[in-house]
Amino acid sequence: MAQTFSDEHFTLGIEEEYLLVDAETYDLAEAPDALMAACADKLSSKVSPEFLQCQIEVGTGVCASIADARADLRNLRATVAECAGRFGLAPIAVSCHPFADWKDQSHTDKDRYNQLARDLGGVVERMLICGAHCHVGLPSENDRVDIMRQMTYFLPHLLALSTSSPFWQGRDTGLASYRLTVFDNLPRTGLPPSFASFDEFQRTVDLLVDMEMIEDSSKIWWDLRPSAAFPTLETRICDVSPRLEDQLSLSALIQCLTRMLMRLRGSNQRWRVYDRFLINENRWRAQRYGVSDGLIDFGRGAVVPLPELVDELIELTEQDAEALGCVDEVQRLRDLAVETSSDRQRKIYKGTRAAGGSHQAAMRSVVEHLLEDFHVDL
């Protein structure tokens, strides 16, 4: 029998991690306790410290639509920027700071982060990276695991469109998402395994918990996972987007893909589940090239340019975008398929150098550009 679903189930929640920079030097700066208190006074539990003291995390409430998510996330960004400004600081939404040194940073003194530092040793010290996580509501536990198996195919597409981390410690890495290179040093990361049911997933988690390897599934950091805290499927592969509207377009696509896969299942159809080895090749291509080169279409047996793939995704999710009220946001992905933040950052750097600026001046120009991007849609 074909299964049905309600569009009310596909709620959205968006989490973003920001870096705090000194408004004068553009280098990283630690968040003073008074700043966190000021943010909490206005945003309550929607704002929190992150692993490093130069980071801050925000999270929307449960949003019924992309319009609700826009209003919530815009307020979060604007409030954090306003509060930070009182202390001579400013937030940037970027996955790697262009020139800051991870060795100069300190981790936040909280039980969870102290435990991470003890468990992960020197690997976690390099986690000077920020990501964006998108939660889509799926009330059924088995639905979350089933859709996770199918959605994994699209993770490289989402990564390519989100890339914002070409620089690391003052040099061009040659990658569009260096963040993933750093993050993949942690255990329990990468593409999720394929589970036949939620029970199988839970047994796997319980095995590690029972052996005291982890406390719970929140210590599993796959690119896509059933949330440990909410009845959602959490997409975690994306770099954080400097611009608000880019983040919303990516979140809208994730929401639409989730609905599309559920819709197919309602007609007794499903997306083909490819071997993780093949999807990992596309993941690497997205990490390396962003949108400047294509991804492999395994059905065609060919590398297809990102603009063409995005056109296909828009067509594939057309009725889902209409049902969810996010047609404009999904259509905007055509712009990202041509140029992501990584491309813009490199363009700023090269332009400053071509105009006679020093390497240091060019790096500062990139941060200045990121500061402008943070405010462009507020």
Curated annotation (Swiss-Prot):
SUPFAM superfamilies: Glutamine synthetase/guanido kinase. It comes from the Bacteria. NCBIfam families: gshA_cyan_rel, PRK13515.1. Signal peptide: none annotated. This is Putative glutamate--cysteine ligase 2. It is an enzyme of class 6 (ligase). Belongs to the glutamate--cysteine ligase type 2 family. YbdK subfamily. GO terms for biological process: modified amino acid biosynthetic process. Its EC number is 6.3.2.2. It catalyses: L-cysteine + L-glutamate + ATP = gamma-L-glutamyl-L-cysteine + ADP + phosphate + H(+). GO terms for molecular function: ATP binding; glutamate-cysteine ligase activity. It comes from Jannaschia sp. (strain CCS1). Keywords: ATP-binding, Ligase, Nucleotide-binding. ATP-dependent carboxylate-amine ligase which exhibits weak glutamate--cysteine ligase activity.
